[in-house]
């Protein structure tokens, strides 16, 4: 089932963040959400994940979904290793070989046994990405997931994201044109207005 956003609006106090936004996220397809900083991309993500509710309008097709997500701020267990953080969300059927392939794909092979608190910001982002990709979900939402990664690692990571989300609904937020091109999205939602 497609996810349908129907004339939603959202304000925080006097600050209007989204106004009368409508869009569709097709089932099993990749959608890129683009827009400048502060235009409401993250607010839309919070509404899709049911972490907040719109002031007006409605969102259909989210109530029975299994979501996994990469947030702008990572939500990792500081004292656990990168591997343990990833295994927390994996099904028991995931193999060591699949995990090894994942570490290689996003260049984490040297640090997967280290506690997350010892990792750089870019490494932490990649741990968050693997958690979202390897969790049991049918819709993956990523809010600026490649922020802080160098260009070579970004390109390699996007290839792995596309491989692991094939057949799933992927909603990918970026403000960088290059990432939007690399993503080869089936659909693009541009949020143009900053209130």
Task: State what each model feature region is.
Residues 115-123:
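Conserved ABC ATPase signature
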Residues 129:
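Hydrophobic anchor residue at the start of the ABC signature
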């Amino acid at each position: 089932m497609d996810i349908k956003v129907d004339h939603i609006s959202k304000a925080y106090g006097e600050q209007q963040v989204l106004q009368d936004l409508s869009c569709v996220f097709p089932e099993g397809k990749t959608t890129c959400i683009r827009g400048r900083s502060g235009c409401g991309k993250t607010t839309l993500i919070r509404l899709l994940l049911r972490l907040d509710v719109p002031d007006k309008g409605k969102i259909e097709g989210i109530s029975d979904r299994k979501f996994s997500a990469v947030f702008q701020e990572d939500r990792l267990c500081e004292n656990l290793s990168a591997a343990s953080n990833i295994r927390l969300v994996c099904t028991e059927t995931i193999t060591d070989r699949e995990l090894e392939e994942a570490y290689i794909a996003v260049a984490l092979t040297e640090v997967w046994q280290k506690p997350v608190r010892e990792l750089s910001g870019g490494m932490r982002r990649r741990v968050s990405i693997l958690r979202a990709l390897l969790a049991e979900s049918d819709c993956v939402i990523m809010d600026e997931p490649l922020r802080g990664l160098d260009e070579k690692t970004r390109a390699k990571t996007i290839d792995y994201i596309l491989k692991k989300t094939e057949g799933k609904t992927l909603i990918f937020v970026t403000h960088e044109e290059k990432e939007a091109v690399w993503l080869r999205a089936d659909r693009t939602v541009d949020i143009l207005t900053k209130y």
